[in-house]
């Protein structure tokens, strides 16, 4: 049965790539099914919707589940753990998830987990760490002189004020919008709205 690399599967949209990560924004419409595709790198997955879905590994029986908005998990999908599967949407709205493929061949951090105010460690893997962040109105996340690169991903829609290396901006962001933060950058984001702003912060090896 034909399979394609996950980055070439039509519902997996490449939105960012460098030598460390490849970010795929995955959108599966109601009643739609992906092609069989191959996951072959360690990956962090971030879900943005509550959706009833089915999935099937090649030559295996289907499995069914309901995704949870804000759920974040890690899978080591490098050899010999490669996954070949397809996914279909059994619900009435779009299934939305982000796949952050981790491209580094090294498997260990040289630094301990980092203490960042409002950031709570969820995943501690050899390739990446992920932190959950919940900001009430006027609360902020500050990243300064950290030795790792980061990806900050919005879990829900929010109004924010952001300062990056002294440059300030205010915007309304949507779930799945992301920011790449270079090591040693000075970066902060403030919740400028009334509703809670949720994020996932991924520290990259």
Task: Kindly give the residue locations of the regions a language model identified.
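Bacterial Sec-dependent N-terminal signal peptides
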Residues: 1-7
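A short glycine-rich, His/Asp/Glu-containing loop-to-beta-strand
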Residues: 10-35, 41-45, 115-145, 149, ...
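Short acidic-glycine-tyrosine-enriched beta hairpin
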Residues: 16-19, 57-79, 166-184
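Histidine-centered metal-chelating micro-motifs
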Residues: 32-35, 71-86, 139-141, 177-190
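Glycine- and acidic-residue-biased ligand/ion/polar-headgroup-sensing regions
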Residues: 40-59, 146-166
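Surface-exposed beta-loop interaction hotspot
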Residues: 77-80, 84-137
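Ligand-binding loop in jelly-roll beta-barrel domains
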Residues: 79-103, 157, 182-205
């Amino acid at each position: 049965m034909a399979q394609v690399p996950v980055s070439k599967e039509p519902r997996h949209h490449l939105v960012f790539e460098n030598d460390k990560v490849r970010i795929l924004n995955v959108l599966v419409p109601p009643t739609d099914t992906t092609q069989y595709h191959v996951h072959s790198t360690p990956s962090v997955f971030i879900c943005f919707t509550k959706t009833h879905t089915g999935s099937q590994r090649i030559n295996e029986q289907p499995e069914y589940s309901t995704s949870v908005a804000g759920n974040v998990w890690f899978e080591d999908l490098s050899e010999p753990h490669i996954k070949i599967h397809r996914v279909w949407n059994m619900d009435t709205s779009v299934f939305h998830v982000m796949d952050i493929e981790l491209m580094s061949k090294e498997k260990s951090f040289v630094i301990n987990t980092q203490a960042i105010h409002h950031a709570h460690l969820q995943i501690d893997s050899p390739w990446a760490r992920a932190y959950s962040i919940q900001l009430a109105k006027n609360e902020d996340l500050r990243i300064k002189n950290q030795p790792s690169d980061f990806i900050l991903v919005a879990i829900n829609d929010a109004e924010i004020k952001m300062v990056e290396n002294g440059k300030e901006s205010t915007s309304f962001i949507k779930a799945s919008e992301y920011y790449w933060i270079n090591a040693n950058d000075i970066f902060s984001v403030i919740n400028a709205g009334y509703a809670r702003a949720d994020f996932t912060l991924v520290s990259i090896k």
